[in-house]
C-alpha cells in the first residue's frame, strides 16, 4: 500500500485531494472552491504580517496603517494585497454561490453543505466589516457608527447593545480595539468552518452540471482536476496582481484616506462594494427595525432554497424557465449593488424597493412556482413520448 494511504495523516490528504473521485463532467465553475481556499490563505497570511505592525489604539490606528504603507519593507504590497484580496474573495464567493444556485448544489443530499456555506458567507461579511473599521479612516469611522447603530432598532435593549458594542457612548478606542481582536480571530473560525464544509462535501461528493448522479463516471482528482485548478489559480493571481500593482485603490473608497473625524460627516456613507446590495435592501425599507430585519433576512433566505425548490431535476441546465429567471435574479442583484452606491433620492428609493421585492420573490415565489410548472411540463413530455 502506498505510504500516502497507510499514514494516518497523509491518508486524509489523499482522500480529499489526490484519490478523491470527482464526476468527469464538472466544468470550470467547480474551480471556485479552490480559489476561495487560496483567497483565505492570502488573507490570513497577509493579515498576520500586517498585525505585526498595526496598532489598534484609536490615536495610532490610521497612522500605523500609513506606517505599514511607507516604512515597512514591501508593506504597501501587504496592505494592497490584503485589501484587494478581500474584494476578490467576495467576487469568487459570489460566483461560487451563483454556481450553487444555478446547478442546484443546495438540493438534497447536500443541504448541510449548503447551510455551512451560508454560515461561512455570514462570517466573511462580519470579518470584512470589522477589518474595514480597523483602518479608522473617515469612511471606517462612520461605517462603524452606522452599522452598529442598527442594533438600536431592537426594542427595549437596542441602545444598551450599541453601548456594549462600542464600549462607551460612541465609536472610540475600545471599539477599534475589540473590532481588531475579533477581526484577527474570526478568519480562523472561518478556516474551521471551511474544514466542516469539506467534510460535508466529502460525504456525498461533488455535484455535476448534468444534475444526475456522478457515481457511474468518476475520475481521481489528481492529476486531472489538480492541473485544471492550476489554470484558474494562475489566471486569478494574474488578475489580482494587475489590481495590486497597477490599480490598488479602484475597489476602495477615497474618503478612507482621510483620518476618522467624528465631527465631520461624509457626503455619502457607503460600505465596501461587496456589501452594497444588502445596504440597498436596508435603505429600501423606511422603517428602521423592518429594514434591519429585511437586510439580515436577505442573507438567511438562502437557507430556505432546499425547501422551496420542488423540481424533480437538479440544476437549471435543462430548464429554460429557471435559466431565464436565474439571470433576471443575477441582473437584479447587480442592480441592487448599483443602487446601494447612490444617494437616497428619487428614483433610487423606488428602484431599490422594487429590486428588493424581486430579490425575495425569487426565493419565496418564483423558484417554487417555476419548479412546479416545470415538473408538470416534464411529466407531460414523458407521457407524450
Curated annotation (Swiss-Prot):
Ligand binding (a ubiquinone): 202
Cofactor(s) the record lists: heme b
Further remarks about this protein from its record: Heme 1 (or BL or b562) is low-potential and absorbs at about 562 nm, and heme 2 (or BH or b566) is high-potential and absorbs at about 566 nm.
One GO term describing the cellular component: respiratory chain complex III
Locations listed in the record: Mitochondrion inner membrane
GO BP terms in the entry: mitochondrial electron transport, ubiquinol to cytochrome c
Membrane topology: Multi-pass membrane protein
GO molecular function: metal ion binding; ubiquinol-cytochrome-c reductase activity
Quaternary structure and partners: Fungal cytochrome b-c1 complex contains 10 subunits; 3 respiratory subunits, 2 core proteins and 5 low-molecular weight proteins. Cytochrome b-c1 complex is a homodimer.
UniProt entry keywords in alphabetical sequence: Electron transport, Heme, Iron, Membrane, Metal-binding, Mitochondrion, Mitochondrion inner membrane, Respiratory chain, Transmembrane, Transmembrane helix, Transport, Ubiquinone
Residues that coordinate or bind heme b b566: 96, 197
One Pfam family matching this protein: Cytochrome_B
Cofactor, how bound (note): Binds 2 heme b groups non-covalently.
Descriptive protein name: Cytochrome b
Family: Belongs to the cytochrome b family.
Gene3D superfamilies: Cytochrome Bc1 Complex, Chain C
Residues binding heme b b562: 82, 183
Amino acid at each position: 500500500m502506498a505510504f500516502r494511504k497507510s499514514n494516518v495523516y497523509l491518508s486524509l490528504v489523499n482522500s480529499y485531494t489526490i484519490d478523491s473521485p470527482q464526476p468527469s463532467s464538472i466544468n470550470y465553475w467547480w474551480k471556485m472552491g479552490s480559489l476561495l481556499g487560496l483567497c483565505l490563505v492570502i488573507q490570513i497570511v497577509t493579515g498576520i504580517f500586517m498585525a505585526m505592525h498595526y496598532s489598534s489604539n484609536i490615536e495610532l490606528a490610521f497612522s500605523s496603517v500609513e506606517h505599514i504603507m511607507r516604512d515597512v519593507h514591501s508593506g504597501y504590497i501587504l496592505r494592497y494585497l490584503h485589501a484587494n484580496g478581500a474584494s476578490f474573495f467576495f467576487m469568487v464567493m459570489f460566483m461560487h454561490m451563483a454556481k450553487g444556485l444555478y446547478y442546484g448544489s443546495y438540493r438534497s443530499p447536500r443541504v448541510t453543505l449548503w447551510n455551512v456555506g451560508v454560515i461561512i458567507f455570514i462570517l466573511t461579511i462580519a470579518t470584512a466589516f470589522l477589518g474595514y473599521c480597523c483602518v479608522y479612516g473617515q469612511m471606517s469611522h462612520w461605517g462603524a457608527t452606522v452599522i452598529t447603530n442598527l442594533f438600536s432598532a431592537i426594542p427595549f435593549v437596542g441602545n444598551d447593545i450599541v453601548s456594549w458594542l462600542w464600549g462607551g457612548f460612541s465609536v472610540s478606542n475600545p471599539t477599534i480595539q475589540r473590532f481588531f481582536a475579533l477581526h484577527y480571530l474570526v478568519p480562523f473560525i472561518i478556516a474551521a468552518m471551511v474544514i466542516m464544509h469539506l467534510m460535508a462535501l466529502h460525504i456525498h461528493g461533488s455535484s455535476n452540471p448534468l444534475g444526475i448522479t456522478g457515481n457511474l463516471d468518476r475520475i481521481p482528482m489528481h492529476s486531472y482536476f489538480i492541473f485544471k485548478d492550476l489554470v484558474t489559480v494562475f489566471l486569478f493571481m494574474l488578475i489580482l496582481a494587475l489590481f495590486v500593482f497597477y490599480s490598488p485603490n479602484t475597489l476602495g473608497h477615497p474618503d478612507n484616506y482621510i483620518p476618522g473625524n467624528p465631527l465631520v460627516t461624509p457626503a455619502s456613507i457607503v460600505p465596501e462594494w461587496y456589501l452594497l446590495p444588502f445596504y440597498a435592501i436596508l435603505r429600501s425599507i423606511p422603517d428602521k427595525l423592518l429594514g434591519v430585519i429585511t437586510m439580515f433576512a436577505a442573507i438567511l433566505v438562502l437557507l430556505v432554497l432546499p425547501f422551496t425548490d420542488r423540481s424533480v431535476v437538479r440544476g437549471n441546465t435543462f430548464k429554460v424557465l429557471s435559466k431565464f429567471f436565474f439571470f433576471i435574479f443575477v441582473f437584479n442583484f447587480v442592480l441592487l449593488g448599483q443602487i446601494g452606491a447612490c444617494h437616497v433620492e428619487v428614483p433610487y428609493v423606488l428602484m431599490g424597493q422594487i429590486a428588493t421585492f424581486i430579490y425575495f420573490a425569487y426565493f419565496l415565489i418564483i423558484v417554487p412556482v417555476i419548479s412546479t410548472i416545470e415538473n408538470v411540463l416534464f411529466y407531460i413530455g414523458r407521457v407524450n413520448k
